[in-house]
Every structure is written in C-alpha cells, then in structure tokens.
Curated annotation (Swiss-Prot):
The gene is recF. It comes from the Bacteria. ATP binds at residues 30-37. The lineage of its organism: Bacteria, Pseudomonadati, Chlorobiota, Chlorobiia, Chlorobiales. Keywords: ATP-binding, Cytoplasm, DNA damage, DNA repair, DNA replication, DNA-binding, Nucleotide-binding, SOS response. This is DNA replication and repair protein RecF. Belongs to the RecF family. Pfam families: SMC_N.
C-alpha cells in the first residue's frame, strides 16, 4: 500500500494543507510545533479512522472551526486506487468514506490500509501499564486478522454484560445465577479464542523481532512472552481445553467477583513480558534501550504484516531518532530501506542520504504551526 497524496482542512494547526510523499523514505522535517505530527495523524485517520495520539475528534479541530476534513488517495500493490475521506463536525460527529461509500461500523475499515506507527508516547508500551501492551497487541492483530477483531469486540461486549450482571447480583437488584452461568460460558469461550490467538501471534512476531533486536542492541537473549492473569497456559492447549479451564477459574473466583463486581481474570487483565538477557527491560533498561526495544517491535511488526498480508503496510514514525546514537540511527535507516513507504518526522532534514527530505513549512497551503 502507498499513499499518493493527502489533503487536510481545519485539522489541528493546518487550515489547509497538501502532502505528496515519496514511494520510499520521506523525512518530513521542521521545528517543534510546526505541525509535522499532525500530518502523520491525518494519515493515521485515513488508515485506522482514529487519532494517532488517541485524541477525541473535538481536539483535532483547528482553532475556532466547526469541522475538519481529511482526504487521502492510496494505491494498492496491485495498482487499485483507494480514496478515503474522514470528516468530523461538532453537530454530526464523524463520517468515514471509502471510495465515496460510507463505512459503518468504523471497525470494518481496519486492515484495509495497513499502518504501523511510532510516536514518543508509545514508549509506554515498554515501560507503562499492562493496558498499553494489550492495546499494542490488539491493534496489531486487529489489522492482520479480521476474525480476531470480531472476536475481541464480542469478548468486550460479553465482558461488559457479565460485569453488569455481577453488579446486579451483588446489589440484589436483578439477575440470576443461571444467567451468570450462561454469560460465564460465553465469556470463557471467547477468552480462550482471544488468548490463544495472542500467544500464536507473539510466537510468529518473535521470529522477526529477535534478530532485529540483536542488530540494534547486540547479541544476547531478547524475548517477548505472554503473561496470563489465568496462570501458565500449556503449549498445545486446545480452545475447548482452555475454555473449560476458564470456566473453572471463573467459578472458583465467583465469590470474589461478586464482591468486586468485576471479572478478575481473562484477556482484559493479561500482560506482555519484555526480557533482555533475562532481565525485564521495563525495570532495568535505560531510556535508550527501551526505545530501541520498541523500535525493534515496530520493525518486526512491519515484517510480520508484509509476510502475512496482501498489502505492505505504510510506516508512520514520529520523532523516532531522538535519544539514539548515530550508529543505531544508521542501522535503522538500513532496515527501513526495505520497508516500503515510510514517513518520518524530525527537526533535522539531513538524517540519511537514502531519504527524501521535505520541509513541512514548504507544503502547499502551509500557514504556520
């Protein structure tokens, strides 16, 4: 997949802007606050229908404006043209269109334009809460496996229903134990499917991650493993076997769950463990080591997508090279040369000779950040 051009109107600090990136590596440079990240965010909207930074649409409006429009033109590996339009108005909400047809729900669009991102705030994947790592997992799998996304959404819906029933039972305001058993069985089956797919994905991702991390961090053991709130999950466990174990666990903890009015184990409570030479990098890695670990994860994700999907992903990397030395920066650029279309932002336009440098202030329509 390749972005041909993108145009924005009333988005962030851009009242009108157009951008045509190169096929390979494009370095979009400019001073801090000039709107470089906003360009990546607009592309991210076209790919995944939401902000790169996790911001609500209302925060993406240009100052004093009532609406924004993002229009992107893409071309697939087979030469098929894709037109994406994302618009938002205070009075009507968000609208996503693909080739002039409305997309509903928005989740139907996920995976159409594969996209891999890096932003400084994503270091929380390595050193933040378990929720950040689960989000990384779910975002990656949702783009590459439609069935996973559907099952994850079903899991979240059933989890919400079960928690609501636990609250009803705890407060004696309705519900029945028979109904709880039914929701428990449904949740256990979905939990088994989500968990097993996550574990399988990490095994596939590790094939690409470990050599990349070795090239950036040096020889040693670099591992990404799944940490289940359920306990150890034996290799080769079937979905039915794991479902039965979840049912047993839910029944064992039912009294505590009624007291807390929440489901205490399952994929929504799981985590990832990142190890470098046997030590948890979240606790013992320096900022530079943690950043290199995250970059290796993202580059591994590119290779995973490239081998699994019919379309090569677009890479959107925001301020990736700060805190990295010249040797690591050069090594990453060498890897990026094989990564299809990559758009980087930086304050320095002379990072690497293989890249095309474009000043954000020189883009058509630019009026200042």
């Amino acid at each position: 997949m390749r972005l041909k051009n993108i145009q924005v109107e009333n988005f962030r600090n851009h009242h009108s802007l157009a951008f045509q990136p190169e096929e390979g590596i494009t370095v979009l440079y400019g001073p801090n606050g000039s709107g470089k990240t906003s360009v990546l965010e607009a592309i991210h909207y076209c790919a995944l229908t939401k902000s790169l930074l996790g911001a609500p649409e209302s925060e993406c409006l240009a100052f004093s404006e009532e609406y924004f429009i993002i229009s992107g033109e893409f071309v697939s590996t087979r030469g098929t043209s894709l037109s994406v339009k994302v618009s938002y108005g205070k009075d009507r909400g968000k609208l996503v269109q693909l080739n002039q047809s409305e997309v509903k729900p928005f989740s139907q669009h996920v995976g159409t334009i594969p996209c891999i991102t890096f932003s400084p705030s994503e270091i929380a994947i390595v050193n933040g809460s378990p929720g950040e790592r689960r989000r990384f997992l779910d975002n990656a799998l949702s783009q590459s496996d439609r069935r996973y996304l559907d099952e994850l959404l079903d899991y979240r819906r059933v989890l919400q229903q079960r928690n609501a029933l636990l609250l009803q039972l705890a407060s004696s305001s309705g519900g029945s134990r028979e109904m709880l058993d039914l929701w428990t069985e449904n949740l256990a089956d979905l939990a088994a499917g989500v968990t097993l797919r996550r574990i399988s994905f990490l095994g596939e991702l590790s094939v690409y991650f470990e050599p990349l991390q070795t090239s950036l961090a040096g020889k040693g053991s670099h591992l990404v493993t799944y940490r289940s709130s359920f306990g150890t999950i034996d290799s080769g466990l079937s979905r039915d076997e794991l479902r039965d174990r979840y049912i047993k666990r839910f029944k064992e903890t039912q009294r505590q769950e009624l007291l807390r009015t929440q489901t205490m184990s399952g994929p929504h409570r799981d985590d990832l463990l990142f190890l470098s030479n046997g030590r948890e990098i979240k606790k013992y890695g320096s900022q530079g080591q943690q950043r290199a670990f995250l970059i290796s994860l993202k580059l591994a994700l590119f290779r995973y997508f490239s081998h699994r999907l019919p379309e090569s992903p677009i890479c959107l990397f925001d301020d990736m090279f700060s805190e990295l030395d010249a040797e690591r920066t050069s090594e990453i650029f060498n890897i990026l040369e094989d990564c299809g279309q990559t758009i980087l932002t930086t304050t320095d336009g002379s990072l690497h000779p293989a890249s095309q440098a474009v000043s954000v202030t020189a883009l058509p329509g630019y009026r200042g950040g």
